[in-house]
Curated annotation (Swiss-Prot):
PROSITE patterns: NAD_G3PDH (PS00957). Pathway: Membrane lipid metabolism; glycerophospholipid metabolism. Its EC number is 1.1.1.94. Coiled coil: none annotated. It catalyses: sn-glycerol 3-phosphate + NAD(+) = dihydroxyacetone phosphate + NADH + H(+); sn-glycerol 3-phosphate + NADP(+) = dihydroxyacetone phosphate + NADPH + H(+). This is Glycerol-3-phosphate dehydrogenase [NAD(P)+]. NADPH binds at residues 11, 30, 106, 139, 254, 278, 280. InterPro entries: 6-PGluconate_DH-like_C_sf, 6PGD_dom2, G3P_DH_NAD-dep, G3P_DH_NAD-dep_C, G3P_DH_NAD-dep_N, NAD(P)-bd_dom_sf. Catalyzes the reduction of the glycolytic intermediate dihydroxyacetone phosphate (DHAP) to sn-glycerol 3-phosphate (G3P), the key precursor for phospholipid synthesis. Keywords: Cytoplasm, Lipid biosynthesis, Lipid metabolism, NAD, NADP, Nucleotide-binding, Oxidoreductase, Phospholipid biosynthesis, Phospholipid metabolism. It comes from Paucimonas lemoignei.
Length: 335
């Protein structure tokens, strides 16, 4: 199968490495110099060092080449940008002959508060077969060929089947869903909760506290998702509890590292600079807080993280305030 991946960051590169073993894959990046260097060295030293690019993988900065590669037949076009980069990429695709579009990003667009599928529809319309590939997956492990499971969510059944045929393989299991909203909400909010978990762990508050936070965080994800039209069962799957557990507990999680740094008293700007890569939870926290307020949904953990990130609230005082909240029933509707 012909596959073009637009975006040569860590996740785009990792997926390209995995898929190039079985498919004809083009990996596109914006920088001509960077892509030429990757083609010469057969490695993405900037985002995924130590993982050689397969000889069959074509690395290019030629946008037309990447699109022409999938224009005919059963081609698959994958957007491997951040949420912030999705709209500019979709605008580049306007008027182009593309068969479909699947994105990997997780979050809400800053400013508009839109989910990725809403951004794509706004720019490219509703007729294009489109969907999101998500789930618990660190790029480094995918590049190593370690096992993982993902979910493709799309309204178009043929696109779901195409993505399963393309991505499902010896080390990657792919499940399918038509709940695009649920999969996207799970992928967005779990990043915020990973920051919260990093704060707790950085304050050495113990495993009991971590488990409680993850559990009540899942209730927040579900509450928001249902309000936006998602199905509750989606959050019991890979894009919900699966991605939440990995991002909150895995040492490779950038969002968790943000929380650890905040607990140590580091300024957010310093933490982001040290990471060197995108931590979507930082970008997403304000947007989710605003959306929850508009929908009148209680999301106390999300609000607490946004307060620490943007309002100068103390992590320790914030934790104390969360613990001091009035007891209530344990349910999705309760906060």
């Amino acid at each position: 199968m012909r596959i073009s991946i637009l975006g040569a960051g860590a996740w785009g590169t990792a997926l390209a490495i995995a898929l190039a073993e079985r498919h004809d894959v083009v990996l596109w990046g914006r920088s001509e110099d960077a892509m030429a260097q990757r083609a010469r060295s057969x490695e993405n030293t900037a985002y995924l060092p130590g993982h050689p690019l397969p000889a069959a993988l074509k690395a290019t900065a030629d946008f037309s080449l990447a699109l022409d590669h999938v224009a005919q037949g059963d081609g698959l076009l994958i957007a491997a940008t951040s949420v912030a980069g999705l709209r500019p990429l979709a605008q580049q695709l306007q008027g182009k002959a593309i068969p479909n579009l699947v994105w990997l990003c997780k979050g809400l667009e800053e400013g508009s508060g839109l989910l990725p599928h809403q951004v794509v529809r706004e720019v490219l319309g509703t007729q294009l077969p489109a969907g999101v590939l998500s789930g618990p997956s660190f790029a480094q492990e995918v590049a190593q060929g370690l096992p993982c499971a993902l979910v493709i969510a799309a309204e178009d059944a043929a696109l779901r089947e195409l993505v399963v045929a393309a991505v499902h393989g010896p080390a990657i299991r792919v499940y399918s869903s038509d709940d695009v909203v649920g999969v996207e909400v799970g992928g967005a909010v779990k990043n915020i909760l990973a920051i919260a978990t990093g704060i707790l762990d950085g304050m050495s508050l113990g495993l009991n506290a971590r488990a409680a936070l993850i559990t009540r965080g899942l209730a927040e994800i579900t509450r928001l998702g249902i309000a936006l039209g998602a199905r509750a069962e989606t959050f019991m799957g890979l894009a919900g509890v699966g991605d939440l557990i990995l991002t909150c507990t895995g040492d490779l999680s950038r969002n968790r590292k943000v929380g650890l740094g905040l607990a140590q008293g580091k300024p957010l700007e310093t933490i982001v600079t040290e990471l060197g890569h995108v931590a979507e939870g930082v970008r997403c926290a304000a947007a989710v807080r605003n959306l929850a307020q508009q929908l009148q949904i209680e999301m106390p953990i999300t609000n607490a993280v946004a307060g620490i990130l943007f309002d100068g609230h103390s992590p320790r005082a914030t934790v104390e305030q969360l613990l001091a909240r009035h007891p209530r029933d344990e349910s999705i509707s309760a906060s």
